[in-house]
Amino acid sequence: MFSLTQKIGFNAEKTACRYLQKQGLSFITKNFRYKQGEIDLIMSDQSMLVFIEVRYRRFSDFIHPVATVTPLKQRRLIKTALHYLQKHRLLDKISCRFDIVGITADRQITWIKNAIEVEY
């Protein structure tokens, strides 16, 4: 049994996935977990692997959902993505980027490509 918060999160991820597929991305997997991190969606954009954080806010009058991705969350996303790349033996074999999709209660979607910069 899922909590209301989890159901809202799943719906936001489903909405984001459909939106991104309409934009030309291909679905690979969802909810990839490693230790304290989770990547909501992993998709491909032509030959690039895209790690996607989906954020939903019911009340976005004061802060947009995209702005809620903290530096700590960014570090966890990067560590989890590195684990994914190592697990699938893709490290140094494929280009990747980190995108954020923000969704508001009125279903407005904001997609920011390369939202998180990673230094190697």
Curated annotation (Swiss-Prot):
Family per record: Belongs to the UPF0102 family.
GO MF terms held by the record: nucleic acid binding
Protein name: UPF0102 protein CBUD_0259
Residue spans crossing the bilayer: none
Annotated source species: Coxiella burnetii (strain Dugway 5J108-111)
Annotated Pfam families: UPF0102
